[in-house]
Structure formats: structure tokens, C-alpha cells
A protein has these predicted regions:
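Soluble non-cytosolic domains of exported or imported proteins
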Residues: 22, 58, 121-124
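Generic detector of solvent-exposed, compositionally biased contiguous segments
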Residues: 46, 58-82, 145-158
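Short helix-capping/linker turns of helical repeat alpha-solenoids
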Residues: 1, 13-15, 20, 28, ...
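Terminal, low-structured helical/coil segments at or just beyond the last alpha-helical repeat
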Residues: 109-158
Length: 158
């Protein structure tokens, strides 16, 4: 999965091969289906941007959700944005707040800013429920074989 992710990156960034968004997405999907969270994120970005020809926000949300569940803060932030806008998922300020809070807990500065904005839009009860949901969030176990070793070491706090 790691090699597939890296090959997808090469096709996306025109590194050693001719840039080809469709081939990049193909390799990202293979790696993502094996549990590579960065490939999941990049595949979601490809769906969201229309890099493969047509935007598919529901698929973007699905892949952002999977990577977010594996603890990737960039995907947590992007998933929160989708919930806030109702883009590819039903609009839910509670879910947006939850995912911003989870990403903010990992140090994501943009998520911290969005939390401040959403705090003014949610009532105290809703905000407390979203905070409780975020506080209880356990990232799913990360497959060591599907992710880059430094990624696993960082997740484990090593």
C-alpha cells in the first residue's frame, strides 16, 4: 500500500512520470482500500476537486471520513467543512464542530478558528454534546503495513 500511495503521488505531482490525475487516483484507491490513510485523503481530494473529470462530493466525504477515523487531521478538517456546508453529506453544525474539535486537539490551527466561529452558532446544549462526542473520539487502529513507518511512529507517539 505504501508503494501504491507513493506511485499515486508521483502521478499527481509529475515526479518521474508524466502527470496523470486518473492514474494517480487509481493508485491512491488501491492503497486506500488497503488502509493507507494518506491515500484515502488524496483520493478524497481528487473526488472533491474533480481531478478525475467530475466532482463527486459524496465519495469525497466517504474517503475523508475513513481517513478522519484513522486520525488524519487534514481529513478531519475537510470532513468538518463538508458537514458545515452540507456538501456531500447532510449539513450538520454538530458534526462539523465535532470534527473541527478533533482536528484542533491535534494542533490544527484552521480548525481552532472554525471552532470559534461555530461556537457562536450553536447553543450551549448542542456545543456540549459535540464536545463530548469529540472528547470520546478514539482513532481507529492504523495498519502498520499500509502506512509509512514514520506515520505509524508519529501516531503511536514514538
Amino acid at each position: 500500500a505504501v508503494a501504491q500511495y507513493r506511485l499515486g503521488t508521483m502521478y499527481e505531482r509529475d515526479q518521474g512520470v508524466t502527470a496523470d490525475p486518473a492514474k494517480a487516483a487509481h493508485w491512491y484507491e488501491l492503497a486506500a482500500n488497503q488502509g493507507n490513510r494518506k491515500a484515502m485523503h488524496n483520493l478524497a481530494v481528487a473526488y472533491a476537486s474533480g481531478a478525475m473529470g467530475k466532482k463527486n462530493m459524496a465519495e469525497a466525504a466517504r474517503w475523508f471520513s475513513k481517513a478522519a477515523g484513522l486520525g488524519l487531521s487534514d481529513s478531519q478538517f475537510n470532513l468538518a467543512v463538508l458537514y458545515e456546508r452540507g456538501d456531500g453529506v447532510p449539513q450538520s453544525l454538530l458534526d462539523a464542530y465535532k470534527w473541527y474539535a478533533i482536528a484542533a486537539a491535534q494542533g490544527d490551527a484552521e480548525s481552532k478558528q472554525r471552532l470559534q466561529v461555530l461556537s457562536t452558532q450553536l447553543g450551549d446544549t448542542d456545543k456540549a454534546a459535540a464536545q463530548k462526542s469529540a472528547a470520546g473520539f478514539p482513532a481507529a487502529p492504523l495498519s502498520r503495513s499500509a502506512n509509512v513507518p514514520t506515520d505509524v511512529a508519529n501516531l503511536a507517539g514514538n
